[in-house]
Amino acid sequence: MNMNFSFCSTSSELSYPSENVLRFSVASRLFSPKWKKSFISLPCRSKTTRKVLASSRYVPGKLEDLSVVKKSLPRREPVEKLGFVRTLLIDNYDSYTFNIYQALSTINGVPPVVIRNDEWTWEEAYHYLYEDVAFDNIVISPGPGSPMCPADIGICLRLLLECRDIPILGVCLGHQALGYVHGAHVVHAPEPVHGRLSGIEHDGNILFSDIPSGRNSDFKVVRYHSLIIDKESLPKELVPIAWTIYDDTGSFSEKNSCVPVNNTGSPLGNGSVIPVSEKLENRSHWPSSHVNGKQDRHILMGIMHSSFPHYGLQFHPESIATTYGSQLFKNFKDITVNYWSRCKSTSLRRRNINDTANMQVPDATQLLKELSRTRCTGNGSSYFGNPKSLFSAKTNGVDVFDMVDSSYPKPHTKLLRLKWKKHERLAHKVGGVRNIFMELFGKNRGNDTFWLDTSSSDKARGRFSFMGGKGGSLWKQLTFSLSDQSEVTSKHAGHLLIEDSQSSTEKQFLEEGFLDFLRKELSSISYDEKDFEELPFDFCGGYVGCIGYDIKVECGMPINRHKSNAPDACFFFADNVVAIDHQLDDVYILSLYEEGTAETSFLNDTEEKLISLMGLSTRKLEDQTLPVIDSSQSKTSFVPDKSREQYINDVQSCMKYIKDGESYELCLTTQNRRKIGNADPLGLYLHLRERNPAPYAAFLNFSNANLSLCSSSPERFLKLDRNGMLEAKPIKGTIARGSTPEEDEFLKLQLKLSEKNQAENLMIVDLLRNDLGRVCEPGSVHVPNLMDVESYTTVHTMVSTIRGLKKTDISPVECVRAAFPGGSMTGAPKLRSVEILDSLENCSRGLYSGSIGYFSYNGTFDLNIVIRTVIIHEDEASIGAGGAIVALSSPEDEFEEMILKTRAPANAVMEFCSDQRRQ
């Protein structure tokens, strides 16, 4: 038998079998003794040699003739009917895995154990599956790439081949792997389908119990895939059980009029049902991918193995817009329970665990210790660097993780106290929030100040603004820059500069990165809830600043290919804060101090300054130190880093990656720059907030870094309130405002009904549900608002809201780490998308695509997404912009959207510089 092996860096380099090539069996080449060693020794996640394609023009034989299948694994002892089901959930580096986790946690009665596909060797998997009998079934997640690339699929192929007596459900990539491992061909779909809905017909298989079928039913599913199983290549062992309905794929809005989101079940519909027996006896009715050169009318959406309890679903049951998704997972649980109930054998050993709902895994402490040790010495792919992300298990009501040595020692804590004063109906009497900032903090061009500015006139989008400057004894400024990778071995490491209120400085080298430092700092603070329980807002002092996009390396993302010239994170510890309630017009003055120290005079001093402004309600205070702009610079326009042709070529590259299954959506960006000389950042921000007000706007100035941010961001990244509720509000879908009311309404409706924009938004909603699902209580993640259209001064945007209740043992910083960078700026799956974007974008994004906001001393936070923002570093102003690339994108339209998003902040800079020149 002649076998050829070729290395490929992406699945786009795969050459799929032509029609005249005979079907081959994957098993013989993946697990033959000769090849097995080279397969296992491949370096996982390597960009150069991470994938292997084995190809052969020889048919090695039928599946049942393979020696690997004849290998005898010990059969597992069945138990009495299970009251709960323990699932091993294999994560194929996807961004939707924890949506499955959330669903299974509530349906199974216990959370699943999540491992990535290269974290366990076969020997480790064998131990937990067969010796410890730790799991009742296996679910294989979606993921980027192809099952033909070992680095994309990891251990999953071997599990599918050898675990014949364990129920397995493969979703999307897992579905394709089930087909591929038994000899079916995985080929390009007639068209990539991502974030779109299809009607489904099924054959009445038990996996679809209590789920209707057919065109007239309300069973609609969300699809995220570019590859499919070629139905004509299905071996006799695999049975088709579901397929798309011809010409019934469209957008969410097209289907939503009759589709309840996440319906959990209803009586079976009137759709056509084809018995399994008929499929086994007569396969001729099943259409091929291409018949006589014509495009297939149906796409295979579900398969099952005729002998093993193995199932595959090409669509995504975990998506927010898939109906009956919960019912599908419930049916798989029932399949598992019934399977083990039927497996009666008195000759086999009994399970070595107590079958009770309190004990989720056998010898849980030892298992977690082993997992923790693996992650500390392994490939760094674990969630949060410790095993807490894998389990939320409890043994006899005690958190299992408390039995394992904690990764983080408890720091010594200091008690901070809060004093505050409220002045009712004061803001308008002193000229509003602008006058308040200019009087209190606007002198000296706003150096070392912050202003979290809800400048939108719509109070429903943002009620409170917060501001402050160099404060009391607790004030300090943090400036962090990641190290060059050539200098250190840790990709997280960097240099931190700390400046206190007396201008003394201290330098530290942070081996574990900035977020770990911030987590420890916040953990060292204790507080008395009575100090702030009557305040109507959450920020009462603490860290205020910005996190750059490159901090993604501290959040499980790959090594940065580019380094930013600006700092990667800058924060103040603000002990003195002024807050404005825009809804009630109240002003609050707040001051933090350490227990046992003298209280500051900030409350009284600030009160006197505010009272002195009484009567200035109609006059705006100006900064008297505004410099004159060089006339040669005032007329300079912003220059994009990439030309129109280069950007369009990058969009086309993104679409090729999407077609080949490497990503569902890629958020491509570029930078636009111009020299700004000695222009005043605060004056520029005041101009920007008038021209383009936004609910998550901000001004930050860090004088020792020569850095200012003037942001008119409309997007919230993530918020955590005092009740432990996390909220994300991603924006995906943007269109310009109309010049007349009629045109404006038409454009708004056009955005709302756009299939492309709905697909973009849905993909990011599912991604954010996944990110929150990693740190939220099972069953608590929900979507109160899906694809709402919000209108701003220059654009309409499509916005969704995702919420979930934070687990009590998860820190605020770990919540951010789980979701950063914001999915609306990366695409999905996030990890692979970030890798691709880093290869296409020719420079660091810097602070653009990162976050601005606060981490309050009381454990709350609120962060925006840094978009529509002018970043001034040294003498250069930069504006980042881009858009989400999907299969439905038009390269030319994507370039125009990028320019549209740049226009408002760029025009504000041009106008401001021109005005200053005239002065």
From Swiss-Prot:
Molecular function GO labels: 4-amino-4-deoxychorismate synthase activity
Transit peptide: 1-45
Keyword Transit peptide tagged: yes
Keyword Protease included in the entry's annotation: no
GO biological process: 4-aminobenzoate biosynthetic process; chorismate metabolic process; folic acid biosynthetic process; tetrahydrofolate biosynthetic process
Residues at the catalytic site: C172 (nucleophile), H316, E318
Subcellular localization(s) per the UniProt record: Plastid, Chloroplast
Sequence segments annotated as region (PABB component): 436-910
Record-annotated Glutamine amidotransferase type-1 domain positions: 86-342
Record-annotated disulphide pairs: none
The EC number(s) this enzyme carries: 2.6.1.85
Catalytic reaction list: chorismate + L-glutamine = 4-amino-4-deoxychorismate + L-glutamate
Involved pathway(s): Cofactor biosynthesis; tetrahydrofolate biosynthesis; 4-aminobenzoate from chorismate: step 1/2
Superkingdom per UniProt: Eukaryota
Record keywords, A-Z: Chloroplast, Folate biosynthesis, Glutamine amidotransferase, Multifunctional enzyme, Plastid, Transferase, Transit peptide
Activity regulation description: Activated by chorismate and inhibited by dihydrofolate and methotrexate.
GO cellular component: chloroplast
Domain remarks in the Swiss-Prot or TrEMBL record: The PABA component provides the glutamine amidotransferase activity.
Annotated function: Bifunctional enzyme that catalyzes the biosynthesis of 4-amino-4-deoxychorismate (ADC) from chorismate and glutamine. In the first step, a glutamine amidotransferase generates ammonia that is channelled between the binding sites of glutamine and chorismate and used along with chorismate in the second step, catalyzed by aminodeoxychorismate synthase, to produce ADC. Required for the synthesis of 4-aminobenzoate (PABA), an important component in tetrahydrofolate biosynthesis. Does not possess ADC lyase activity.
Family, per entry: In the C-terminal section; belongs to the anthranilate synthase component I family.
Name of protein: Aminodeoxychorismate synthase, chloroplastic
